[in-house]
UniProtKB/Swiss-Prot annotation:
It is found in: Cytoplasm. HAMAP family: Met_tRNA_synth_type1. This is Methionine--tRNA ligase. SUPFAM superfamilies: Anticodon-binding domain of a subclass of class I aminoacyl-tRNA synthetases, Methionyl-tRNA synthetase (MetRS), Zn-domain, Nucleic acid-binding proteins, Nucleotidylyl transferase. Its EC number is 6.1.1.10. Belongs to the class-I aminoacyl-tRNA synthetase family. MetG type 1 subfamily. Gene3D superfamilies: HUPs (3.40.50.620), Isoleucyl-tRNA Synthetase, Domain 1 (1.10.730.10), Methionyl-tRNA synthetase, Zn-domain (2.20.28.20), Nucleic acid-binding proteins (2.40.50.140). Homodimer. Transmembrane segments: none annotated. NCBIfam families: metG, PRK00133.1. Binds 1 zinc ion per subunit. It comes from the Bacteria.
Amino acid sequence: MADPTSSERLLVTAALPYANGPIHIGHLAGAYLPADLFVRYQRLKGEDVAFICGSDEMGVAILMRAIREDRTPEDIIDTYHPQIRDNFERFGMSFDYYGRTSSETHTETTQDFFRVLDENGGFDLKTDEQLYDPEAEMFLADRFVIGTCPVCGFEEAYGDQCEQCGSSLSPTELENPQSTLTDATPEFKETTHWYLPLGELQPQLEEWIGSHPEWKNNVVGQIQSWFDEGLKGRAITRDVLWGVPVPDDVAERHGLEAEGKVIYVWFDAPIGYISATKEWAAEQGEPDAWTDYWQDEDTRLVHFIGKDNIVFHCLMFPSMLMEHGDYVLPDNVPANEFLNLEGEKLSTSRGWAVWLHEYLDDFADERHAPDLLRYALATTLPETKDADFSWEGFQQRVNGELANVFGNFVHRTLTFAQRYFDGTVPPLEDPSEADRVMLDRMAEVPDTVGAAYEEHRTRDAVFETMALARRGNKYFNDTEPWHTHESDPQACANTIHVSLQVCAALSILFEPVLPSAAATLRERIGLENVRTSTPDDDPAGAVGWEDAGAPLLPAGHPIPSGPDPEPLFQKIDDDTIEAQIEKLRDRAAERDTDPSSTTDMDYEALSDNISFDDFTQLDLRAGTVTTAEPVPDADKLLRLEVDLGFEERQILAGVAEQMAPDDVVGLEVVVVANMAPKEMFGFESQGMVLMAEEPDGTFVPVTTEAEDGSVVR
């Protein structure tokens, strides 16, 4: 445990993964890898950090899987919790503690928290009608019900949230609800629940959010959309069979029965950060030290999550903390967007996913295998908008950057040091302008990279680190030591001296993203006493991030890499990549859902016949798109301005996931011109642009060369 007397402590949490399935690369890119890079950077700075995570083992998602597989919830979580924990460790996640919400400590902590809020008058108690499955004879909470989202029209929205537009929902708000257990149409039945009065807390929440202008725009934009709609009370208890039980004494205080009622998973899950911190402190032999990280104003609390969890970490959990009164509020919630795979939405149900455990097994023989995926994902993080991972892109990152740039620079430097300078650091004498410029650039990089990590621009941080390796390669090429070792031995010595200093800097700067390779590099250059980026105690007098820009290897320092140093990275061959792509396609094909292929696919069935009179009611006009721009808080929509010849129309088109604004401007399209205007996301859509949808879901504009305003018949 770090020094609890430090002037500021840093508590970092990563979203608790549901213990109902394995981890995939979308999870890693959303919350876990950015958190780990941030924490490792902070540890290298010598900060007092507690990095907390754990398995979310309560709630409907666990119960649903247990019902589907005819197993108990306990069996489900006992299967996936150790698998998730172990694969995180194999991947290099450096948690101080990884807990689980089925623990006794968590149950006690959650119930105590619930009890305090109830005693403080922090809940509203309401009796109303909820959806009930008459066949299963149970209330349908959260993901036990599916239906049409009232906000965006997505037809497979869950009872607690629409995963298409991110709207926070309750089951009774769904249109055309259906039980996911029996497919029955639910009926209404009366029940009583505790509600968190988010509406009453909105002014406090708005003031708090407004005090953090440094937060990411995608996070603040989503929060603001909820503020604009007006927050509503949210039920934080459920009538289900699995979860943290409502405390008997609290129920009795209100004349109610606690039996059959549990605390909503999104009330108990973030409390899992607190209970895990308690368990971590107890494990360190300081059971009360958890309060230093949760109840001391000198703590900086940062939540790393995916965008689907913004409402819970930016509104619900802060509301709970405010109502309790004893806890610090989050300092930042740097949520990421979604990661796509090979140009398609990642989908576990369709088999369109890269599972972490499969990657680790398939690439077990590759040198620094976890680092390869860490780097490829870190350069593709969906920080402000959705991003795409492809296996060919992975190969390019490994071969073109890790092997050809970073690895090549290190290998050439070590080889020259062994061959021409007896495996030692040669002295730097009378440095040239190129030598000084390289050292000056090296001195600047720690601050540049550090600022990017601090501002949660992780991709920029990794890019700037690799840029130093690129500059090192260019410097090596420009100074031509293969010539100067004969023509000007001191110039050659200067090149190798400076290059070795850059290698030392890179061995620290690359530590957050490439911990295995960075450690290997430090071994090869004999750089010792470097501060650790893992939860271990810092070595006394350790070299840290702040030292990375200075020369760290004195003249005469031995370089223990050996006369023929092994390349730091291996290149990934084409067959390996093709095997991964084929695995994806084969798995999707088994489920008849391969999104990457348009062959042998069923076309959508024809709609029912309409009369000629019905068709003639459509007023179809030719038009030209003159403007296209994203719609705030609506990932699927572009706002178009279309010239119909006789007037300009504003039209919202659901093509943003496939077409960039620049791809749309200038298109000559067909518009349904007599469609009734519709208000969406603060804009009035005054028509519809016709699109063809191919069997694989790709949109293709229906175009025309007719004059703007011409009738299309």
